[in-house]
Protein backbone atom coordinates (compact mmCIF):
# COMPACT_ATOMS: atom_id res chain seq x y z
CA UNK A 1 0.00 0.00 0.00
CA UNK A 2 1.23 3.47 -0.77
CA UNK A 3 0.18 7.05 -0.23
CA UNK A 4 -1.90 6.71 -3.40
CA UNK A 5 -5.15 6.30 -1.44
CA UNK A 6 -4.51 9.54 0.45
CA UNK A 7 -3.94 11.37 -2.83
CA UNK A 8 -7.10 9.87 -4.34
CA UNK A 9 -9.19 10.78 -1.29
CA UNK A 10 -7.83 14.33 -1.35
CA UNK A 11 -8.85 14.66 -5.01
CA UNK A 12 -12.35 13.41 -4.18
CA UNK A 13 -12.58 15.98 -1.39
CA UNK A 14 -11.51 18.78 -3.76
CA UNK A 15 -14.07 17.59 -6.31
CA UNK A 16 -16.85 17.59 -3.71
CA UNK A 17 -15.90 21.07 -2.55
CA UNK A 18 -15.95 22.33 -6.14
CA UNK A 19 -19.11 20.57 -7.37
CA UNK A 20 -21.10 20.56 -4.10
CA UNK A 21 -23.16 17.40 -4.75
CA UNK A 22 -26.31 17.03 -2.68
CA UNK A 23 -25.99 14.56 0.18
CA UNK A 24 -22.19 14.76 0.39
CA UNK A 25 -20.84 14.66 3.95
CA UNK A 26 -17.82 16.63 2.77
CA UNK A 27 -20.07 19.40 1.46
CA UNK A 28 -22.11 19.32 4.67
CA UNK A 29 -19.12 19.94 6.92
CA UNK A 30 -17.43 22.42 4.57
CA UNK A 31 -20.63 24.48 4.46
CA UNK A 32 -20.39 24.81 8.26
CA UNK A 33 -17.05 26.56 7.90
CA UNK A 34 -13.39 26.03 8.60
CA UNK A 35 -13.80 26.39 12.36
CA UNK A 36 -16.32 23.53 12.34
CA UNK A 37 -13.98 21.31 10.31
CA UNK A 38 -11.12 22.17 12.70
CA UNK A 39 -13.30 21.15 15.65
CA UNK A 40 -14.07 17.88 13.87
CA UNK A 41 -10.31 17.26 13.58
CA UNK A 42 -10.05 17.85 17.33
CA UNK A 43 -12.94 15.48 18.07
CA UNK A 44 -11.48 12.78 15.85
CA UNK A 45 -8.08 13.25 17.51
CA UNK A 46 -9.61 12.61 20.92
CA UNK A 47 -11.53 9.59 19.62
CA UNK A 48 -8.29 8.23 18.15
CA UNK A 49 -6.51 8.63 21.48
CA UNK A 50 -9.35 6.93 23.36
CA UNK A 51 -9.42 4.07 20.87
CA UNK A 52 -5.66 3.58 21.25
CA UNK A 53 -5.97 3.30 25.01
CA UNK A 54 -9.23 1.48 25.54
CA UNK A 55 -10.41 -0.25 22.40
CA UNK A 56 -9.33 -2.89 19.91
CA UNK A 57 -7.05 -2.50 16.92
CA UNK A 58 -9.93 -2.40 14.41
CA UNK A 59 -11.58 0.50 16.26
CA UNK A 60 -8.26 2.34 16.43
CA UNK A 61 -7.75 1.89 12.67
CA UNK A 62 -11.27 3.20 12.04
CA UNK A 63 -10.65 6.29 14.17
CA UNK A 64 -7.29 6.98 12.49
CA UNK A 65 -9.04 6.81 9.10
CA UNK A 66 -11.68 9.29 10.33
CA UNK A 67 -8.94 11.60 11.58
CA UNK A 68 -7.04 11.46 8.30
CA UNK A 69 -10.22 12.20 6.31
CA UNK A 70 -11.05 15.25 8.43
CA UNK A 71 -7.43 16.45 8.27
CA UNK A 72 -7.58 16.20 4.48
CA UNK A 73 -10.76 18.30 4.41
CA UNK A 74 -9.10 20.93 6.60
CA UNK A 75 -6.00 20.82 4.42
CA UNK A 76 -8.14 21.39 1.33
CA UNK A 77 -9.73 24.42 2.96
CA UNK A 78 -6.24 25.74 3.80
CA UNK A 79 -4.93 25.10 0.29
CA UNK A 80 -2.42 22.54 1.59
CA UNK A 81 -1.90 19.40 -0.48
CA UNK A 82 -0.72 15.95 0.56
CA UNK A 83 2.43 16.66 -1.47
CA UNK A 84 3.09 19.66 0.78
CA UNK A 85 2.97 17.34 3.78
CA UNK A 86 5.09 14.66 2.10
CA UNK A 87 7.74 17.29 1.34
CA UNK A 88 7.72 18.52 4.93
CA UNK A 89 8.04 14.99 6.27
CA UNK A 90 10.91 14.32 3.88
CA UNK A 91 12.60 17.56 4.93
CA UNK A 92 12.36 16.53 8.59
CA UNK A 93 13.80 13.12 7.84
CA UNK A 94 17.10 14.60 6.68
Curated annotation (Swiss-Prot):
Transmembrane segments: none annotated. It comes from the Archaea. It catalyses: 1-(5-phospho-beta-D-ribosyl)-ATP + H2O = 1-(5-phospho-beta-D-ribosyl)-5'-AMP + diphosphate + H(+). GO terms for cellular component: cytoplasm. One of its GO terms (biological process) is L-histidine biosynthetic process. The keyword Transferase does not apply. Its main location: cytoplasm. Coiled coil: none annotated. Pathway: Amino-acid biosynthesis; L-histidine biosynthesis; L-histidine from 5-phospho-alpha-D-ribose 1-diphosphate: step 2/9. The keyword Cytoplasm applies. It is found in: Cytoplasm. Keywords: Amino-acid biosynthesis, ATP-binding, Cytoplasm, Histidine biosynthesis, Hydrolase, Nucleotide-binding. Its EC number is 3.6.1.31. GO terms for molecular function: ATP binding; phosphoribosyl-ATP diphosphatase activity. Gene3D superfamilies: MazG-like. Belongs to the PRA-PH family. This is Phosphoribosyl-ATP pyrophosphatase. It comes from Saccharolobus islandicus (strain M.16.27) (Sulfolobus islandicus).
Amino acid sequence: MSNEIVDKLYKVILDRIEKRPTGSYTVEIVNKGKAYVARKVGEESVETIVASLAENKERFISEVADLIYHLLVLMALEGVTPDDIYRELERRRK
